[in-house]
């Protein structure tokens, strides 16, 4: 079983955004994390996904300064993203799985961009972190 850890900052105000689209963007990342944690190379008793929200102050998103932003991190302890695809991860048709369509993260990036936000990824074996930053003010 995969353990889901929710670490939410209750002080974050409602985002001026389309909630359903943001849910879709987040679920695309969570789905990938679950698939990575289900791979044969992972000890299935230790798999975990952390959903963490925090306020970020003084953020520059797409060349625009914002006094306040919300940061959503999706962290998993899976095998990591292969180095040969990490730099092109958000482009269409890029997938680390033979059965993957390569569309989920491309859609995520498009949704976050439409909300004037930023999505980034850092990955190594045992620690992959997607970070979504969205303007609040």
Predicted regions: what is each one?
Residues 76:
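Acidic ATP/Mg2+-coordinating residue in the GHKL
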Residues 3-13, 56:
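Conserved catalytic submotifs in the C-terminal HATPase_c
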Residues 14-17, 96:
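Conserved micro-motifs of the catalytic ATP-binding
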Residues 112-113:
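Detector for a conserved hydrophobic position within an alpha-helical segment of the HATPase_c
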Residues 67-69, 81-93:
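Short conserved segment of the HATPase_c
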Residues 104, 108:
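Short alpha-helical Gxxx[C/S/T] motif in the catalytic ATP-binding
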Residues 34-70:
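ATP-lid-like helix-loop hinge signature
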């Amino acid at each position: 079983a995969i353990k889901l850890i929710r670490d939410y900052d209750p002080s974050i105000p409602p985002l001026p955004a389309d909630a359903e689209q943001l849910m879709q963007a987040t679920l695309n990342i969570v789905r990938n994390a679950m698939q990575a944690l289900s791979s044969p190379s992972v000890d299935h008793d230790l798999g975990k996904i952390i959903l963490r929200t925090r306020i970020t102050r003084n953020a520059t998103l797409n060349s625009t300064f914002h006094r306040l932003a919300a940061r959503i991190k999706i962290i998993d302890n899976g095998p990591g993203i292969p180095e040969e695809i990490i730099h092109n991860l958000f482009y269409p048709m890029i997938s680390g799985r033979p059965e993957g369509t390569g569309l989920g993260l491309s859609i995520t990036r498009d949704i976050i961009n439409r909300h004037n936000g930023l999505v980034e990824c850092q990955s190594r074996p045992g620690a992959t972190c997607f970070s979504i930053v969205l303007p609040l003010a």
